[in-house]
Amino acid sequence: MPWFPVKKVRKQMKLLLLLLLLTCAAWLTYVHRSLVRPGRALRQRLGYGRDGEKLTGVTDSRGVRVPSSTQRSEDSSESHEEEQAPEGRGPNMLFPGGPRKPPPLNLTHQTPPWREEFKGQVNLHVFEDWCGGAVGHLRRNLHFPLFPHTRTTVTKLAVSPKWKNYGLRIFGFIHPARDGDIQFSVASDDNSEFWLSLDESPAAAQLVAFVGKTGSEWTAPGEFTKFSSQVSKPRRLMASRRYYFELLHKQDDKGSDHVEVGWRAFLPGLKFEIIDSAHISLYTDESSLKMDHVAHVPQSPASHIGGFPPQGEPSADMLHPDPRDTFFLTPRMEPLSLENVLEPCAYAPTYILKDFPIARYQGLQFVYLSFIYPNDHTRLTHMETDNKCFYRESPLYLERFGFYKYMKMDKEEGEEDEEEEVQRRAFLFLNPDDFLDEEDEQDLLDSLEPTDASVQQSHRTPTPAASTGTTASPTPPTTSPLDEQTLRHSRALNWAPRPLPLFLGRAPPPRTVEKSPSKVYVTRVRPGQRASPRALRDSPWPPFPGVFLRPKPLPRVQLRVPPHPPRTQGYRTSGPKVTELKPPVRAQTSQGGREGQLHGQGLMVPTVDLNSSVETQPVTSFLSLSQVSRPQLPGEGEEGEEDGAPGDEATSEDSEEEEEPAAGRPLGRWREDAINWQRTFSVGAMDFELLRSDWNDLRCNVSGNLQLPEAEAVDVVAQYMERLNAKHGGRFSLLRIVNVEKRRDSARGSRFLLELELQERGGSRQRLSEYVFLRLPGARVGDEDGESPEPPPAASIHPDSRPELCRPLHLAWRQDVMVHFIVPVKNQARWVVQFLADMTALHVHTGDSYFNIILVDFESEDMDVERALRAAQLPRYQYLKRTGNFERSAGLQTGVDAVEDPSSIVFLCDLHIHFPPNILDSIRKHCVEGKLAFAPVVMRLGCGSSPWDPHGYWEVNGFGLFGIYKSDFDRVGGMNTEEFRDQWGGEDWELLDRVLQAGLEVERLRLRHFYHHYHSKRGMWATRSRKGARAQRS
């Protein structure tokens, strides 16, 4: 190409390369900005650890997962739009076939139109009756963030409802007063988070300040600098723009609830000021919207739906996978393949109460439980820390002694026999004959007034000969005035002469004494009467015979005194004081021995010196036996140290705090308990399930289904498989036993529900789910209707008189029967929406279309229930409207009356239920027309608990969730609508009585993943609050 300027290009090569480089840089900059603008950053998140393991998130000490958007909140340039919650179980993940990956977040990018009249207030959403103190606990709420309990507004960012167990979501726009760098700070009790967007879009909100993550952090009102996380970095804001913000707050049941947001210009010395109405505005006006309208509710990285619960080891055993949860999806065997496998037999158990009169509400006593194999892990083992009723032990006994009685400690060399150990550790039992009778007790009451000392001395004071056992004059010695005053307020106790110590432990070696006195005087003394140290040294305190074999220090006692003690002689009374023990006064005796010194003297007890005057009447107190002992005298710290034993180291439960010895005082004689780290023990295998029976235990609400022994289940399955292969020539092989349920009848036999996974030769896996009856030898029952008489017993039992399986007549369940869920509702918008969403998910993930939803609406004002039913993707639904107050019995009866097919199942349901994926299959299996009704046990979730972290108890007393055929429901008379009207509670028990009297069995089982949501009861009974609020309630 002669026209191409090759020489010029060669000369300007460097300029051309620079131009090319600048062009590439400009193009890359344009591409980067175009991708970053909608929130898709090019850089890769550092989501992998050192060893290549993926980091799923951060979990705090309480198990609350910290959202990934808050882990790097300081990086304001990072977009949070594509951040997703960790993989796990979402609301639909309990259903088989659900999505394995979380759906993308539907964050709000477009804001609704804003008007000038929005200024001066912001939106406030309240989530009531939800426990926990962390914002993560609020995000666990089933209705967060779209369906709050209350929608209202607030005029400044400082809220204190003076309530407990709630969560707040405050959102709107902030209007800065001037351009510049602004710092924000949040303070609250308990945790809170403040999110701020760089513009008016909720999708761009970033966490800028927060108080705690675990729920234990809090601040005082206006304390903006307690935590470093409270204060944000400076943010460049412009007065001409508005910025979306969001404030999340969680309050538990303690403390002074408050949450406030302050701001200040980024200048030295300025303090934070509350953001008031002049600088805030509404996000949107919700006053005219019903509670089921949620399209306007903003979803931001702080508050959005679609996040899954945190991953981790399940806290409950019931959350682990079980074949029962998905076995209903396996194709069922054709009924023709099971005909004539077992011979038919009549089924009429002896526990049927047909036409048997029972008292009101006594049907609970005639409901029996079924045995399950294999273990379905419905026992709430994670709740047994607080409730140990499963072990059939007294809670007080377990708290005091634990489970040591099930352990046999191994003996060591030189250790005494176990029986001697028991005797050595026995408690002191006093002889009742040695205590005072009623007359003596009356004398004791009279002794509170000054009486003649000689009378009391003649009754209660032993002679020296009696107390010492030596030959002396029978005349009592003269006593000092101090002894007379002491004896006036004395009480004699005749101790039983037992050599056992009072406290547990090794008994100290006996001491050589001449003879123990038969009575001990416990006296009250006046303050100011104290013996000299010399008298104490010369007269040591003798131990009580048979009670204490060595001295024990008396703990300091705090006595209860009147709040306003009387004043005497102008002296000022002082408050209660803890006084020290006063040593005993040496009495005048005619004996010089140690034992003779006990006569005529009393035990000094600690008193409270209310006045400084001696004339003031003393405040006295009777002490327990463990406190009646000699105080440790000075200089006796090391005396008798070698005589001690572990049993002497036990102290009173009231004296938990030990006094530190003063300088120069010798340490006490008490030694630390010895710990034997090498102690071993023997124990046998304990099966506490053997202690349970099929009686409906109404006292223990954490125990699971009864466990069927494996040998019994395997034996029944082996008999059935033998008969099945005998008919089909070995065409089926057993893969596994999925479920076996047994209802016991000790007189005629047991009913079994067998659910087996079989493999057909050359075919696919199939599901066998049939009722069989294990008839006892010699048991013969005629059919109720006279149809299909039972063959004689000789032809139906084995020669060795073994029980044999047979097919119970009229006890076959239908797989394609229609199930009608009947739910009465009123002003429960958020729960109606959740119920319809759960039913839609049940239809989508199971593919089962044989169910119908019947909602009976009592003039709900917070939503259009009929419109919500039409919008839901349900196979069938019916909307029934009633007027007046809410009546559960009338609502249920109205729903049943709307069912036309008598051979369909009606399930009397509640609105706040979380259903397991196999709920339809469970209802059909346990409802047989004319024979069986089904009352599954639901687990009531506690406050702040969710289906993915269930904490609660089984509702063993409730029968409100009830499945029964329409024909049987009509035959028993339906609901009692006359007696149970405005209130509910008891209508389920009354229905149960009539169902049992009609001759039906009621199957009672605890279902896995079957929960009753914890919900607020405020507003459910149309109650009025003392002070109305401008709010919409759901």
Swiss-Prot record:
Transmembrane parts of this sequence: 13-31
Enzymatic reactions: an N-acetyl-beta-D-glucosaminyl derivative + UDP-N-acetyl-alpha-D-galactosamine = an N-acetyl-beta-D-galactosaminyl-(1->4)-N-acetyl-beta-D-glucosaminyl derivative + UDP + H(+)
Biased composition, class Basic and acidic residues, residue ranges: 72-83
Physiological role: Transfers N-acetylgalactosamine (GalNAc) from UDP-GalNAc to N-acetylglucosamine-beta-benzyl with a beta-1,4-linkage to form N,N'-diacetyllactosediamine, GalNAc-beta-1,4-GlcNAc structures in N-linked glycans and probably O-linked glycans.
Glycosylation sites: 106, 611
Compartment annotation: Golgi apparatus, Golgi stack membrane
Residue span(s) of domain PA14: 109-279
Segments in the Cytoplasmic topological domain: 1-12
Disulfide bonds: none
UniProt KW Cell inner membrane keyword: no
Topological type in the membrane: Single-pass type II membrane protein
SUPFAM superfamilies in UniProt: Nucleotide-diphospho-sugar transferases
GO cellular component terms, A-Z: Golgi cisterna membrane
Keyword terms of this UniProt record: Glycoprotein, Golgi apparatus, Membrane, Signal-anchor, Transferase, Transmembrane, Transmembrane helix
Chain residue ranges for the region called Disordered: 51-104, 450-486, 556-600, 626-669, 782-801
Segments in the Lumenal topological domain: 32-1034
Domain of life: Eukaryota
Feature: compositional bias, Low complexity: 461-473
Residue spans of biased composition, Acidic residues class: 636-661
Protein's recorded name: N-acetyl-beta-glucosaminyl-glycoprotein 4-beta-N-acetylgalactosaminyltransferase 1
An example Gene Ontology molecular-function term: glucuronosyl-N-acetylgalactosaminyl-proteoglycan 4-beta-N-acetylgalactosaminyltransferase activity
UniProt xrefs under InterPro entries: Chond_GalNAc, CS_glycosyltransferase, Nucleotide-diphossugar_trans, PA14/GLEYA, PA14_dom
Lineage: Eukaryota, Metazoa, Chordata, Craniata, Vertebrata
EC code: 2.4.1.244
UniProt similarity note: Belongs to the chondroitin N-acetylgalactosaminyltransferase family.
Top class in the EC scheme: transferase
